[in-house]
Amino acid sequence: MEISFQEGDAVWTEMRERGKNELYYMAGVICKYGDVVGMTEGMHKIMCKVVEKKTGVPELDTCPQRLVLMPRGSGKSTIISQAYVVQRIVQDPNIAILICNEKLENAQSFLAAIKHTFEQNELFRALYPEVIHPDIKAANVKWNDTEINVPRTTGRKEFT
């Protein structure tokens, strides 16, 4: 997607807000996973609403835990373990998130994909400059295979 907005204009503001508030949009458009996992409204939009607790069904939206079961290759991990984490960081840069998996390599792969979004995704970087370090190689910035830290407004000791 060619960037055709200026920071602060109506298009920029709308895209930022949609990404912050709609996981389906964050995953499919901003993180660019739509074509990668073949996102569809019928399956993936519903999954995103369940994850975000925005189904409109009080019993689902107020439940403290959610279990999402989908077939292998359907994009569940890409959307939930990557795009949802990116969205939560954008919503609250002071958050601390633990990414775990049965295999360490999978958790590291999820973090690598998240880092790629922050480092290489020009659309994401243009929409959310406040969570991008100007110099991720700086000595005081944690940015490696096991932990990252985005700019924060608090002195929280845990990494992002």
Tell where the protein language model's regions lie, with residue ranges.
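Conserved aromatic-histidine-acidic binding/catalytic patches
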Residues: D35, R72-G73, L98-E102
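Short, well-ordered loop/turn elements at secondary-structure boundaries
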Residues: T62-C63, P93-N94, G155-R156
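Glycine-rich phosphate-binding loop of nucleotide-binding enzymes
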Residues: Y84-N101, E105, A112
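Walker A/P-loop
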Residues: L60-A83
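N-terminal accessory segments
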Residues: M1-P64
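Contiguous, well-ordered alpha-helical segments that form the cores/surfaces of helical PPI scaffolds
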Residues: K45-E52, T78-V90
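Conserved nucleotide-state-sensing and coupling region of NTP-binding domains
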Residues: C100-T160
